[in-house]
Amino acid sequence: MIKTIVLSMCLAASLLSLNAHAQDVRQYSEGPVTEVNYIQVEYGHFEEYIDWLNSTWKPTMEAFMKAGLIIDYKVFRLTPKSPGQPNVILWITYKNMAGLDKGAEEEEVAKKVICSTECQNKARVGRNEYRKVLGTEYIRELILK
């Protein structure tokens, strides 16, 4: 009888360890990484900013996609809940985290599409008169199994 109880306890313990091992396996895989830029465009300048997005930012993003540097990009309009919050989000999706390390390649593509780095920096200063970059965050898609 004691042998049966001990054997039953050993069997139960081994089943628990199998269940614990199964929980060690990730139930997701890591997907694309998206850079989310929060922008606040001053009142009265929204169309001006959209014109810049269409004339410069969009062709640059298309060139990045053609070069294989990004896999997607989007623009979102938000309704701010309070002052100091963004009203535009620029969304750039990379295949993985390694895609974020391609700054030199992105700069070369941007020079071909827009102009030199110095020229781009001067244009940024001009845009900063009517828009403010509130911050950037990176989010990663988790693909559930």
Task: Label each region the model flagged.
Residues 25-28, 63-71, 91-140:
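An amphipathic, aromatic/His-enriched active-site/gating alpha helix that lines ligand/cofactor pockets
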Residues 16-22:
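Sec/Tat signal peptide C-region and signal peptidase I cleavage site
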Residues 79-92:
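Charged, often glycine-rich, active-site loop that binds/positions anionic groups
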Residues 1-9:
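Bacterial N-terminal signal peptides that target proteins for export
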